[in-house]
Amino acid sequence: MHTYIYIYTVYIQMVAFSPYRIVLPFVAFVDLASFSSFRSYQAFLRPFLRPFRHQTCSSYFALDLDFASAFVVPAASFVESLLAYQAYSAYQACLAYPACLACQAS
């Protein structure tokens, strides 16, 4: 059974300053085992990615999740947490670029 709680934990940290900061802590308790694949999980998360205005950063994070999707479904929970951390790290690295900083400042 895969609950993706680790990925939710990382995601909650990412949107800590967004309008979703009130909703996501409750969503984190939802059992996501009913999702048949990581694709459906991605589709579920897609609306929550909207607060990220910089297209490059959002695309980079989505691409990293897409790459990880081939491994998350059959993986054990500790592997899921590693993949989630990798995706979050990649997103943070993208935010460090001047273009992202300029976009956030606007």
Swiss-Prot record:
GO terms for biological process: protein targeting to vacuole. Disruption phenotype: Causes a vacuolar protein sorting defect. The keyword Transmembrane helix applies. The keyword Cell inner membrane does not apply. The chain crosses the membrane at residues 10-30, 65-85. Keywords: Membrane, Transmembrane, Transmembrane helix. GO terms for cellular component: membrane. It is a multi-pass membrane protein. It is found in: Membrane. Partially overlaps SRP54. Disruption phenotypes caused by deletion of this gene may also be a result of a defect in its overlapping gene. This is Putative uncharacterized protein VPS69. The gene is VPS69.
